């Protein structure tokens, strides 16, 4: 039994160390002027795991650069955007992987966060990979309905929770 537990811990540590979330492209809905952009950026700058922020105001997109080995909190990003009076149109992470084999319904623990890969084929991830967060509040209502239809067999997509975890985020490759 001890051998089995040790194997499980080593496997989990391997999964955790095979990834590094580097940055995110955050599309914000409702930005209409420079003051709106300033208010949003000011809120985002209060997040401790963000190292720096770039922006593309023509596309209402912020590039969030994360501190090395930071524990990323997607709900905090969402909360800060909403505190500024806006909503998220999309959140696309760029993460660096080393030989991480995934398939549909694969679960990845990164730091303290559980991610569930949906609508993906079996593939080995190497280098920088773009991952779209597809949970409610991180995509448009239309996209959420489309993903929800594809995810009918995954109750965690509807609730955002797994039986053995407080929160689970759902990702797809792009």
What feature does the model see in each segment?
Residues 1-23:
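Bacterial Sec-dependent N-terminal signal peptides
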Residues 40, 74-85:
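Short amphipathic alpha-helices in soluble, non-transmembrane regions
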Residues 23-65:
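Start-of-domain marker
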Residues 67-72:
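Helix N-cap motif at beta-to-alpha junctions
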Residues 13, 27-30, 150:
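Processing junctions and N-termini across compartments
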Residues 86-171:
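Thiol/selenol-based redox catalytic cores and closely related redox-interacting motifs
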Residues 6, 54-55, 91:
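Residue-level detector of family-conserved "landmark" positions at structurally sensitive sites
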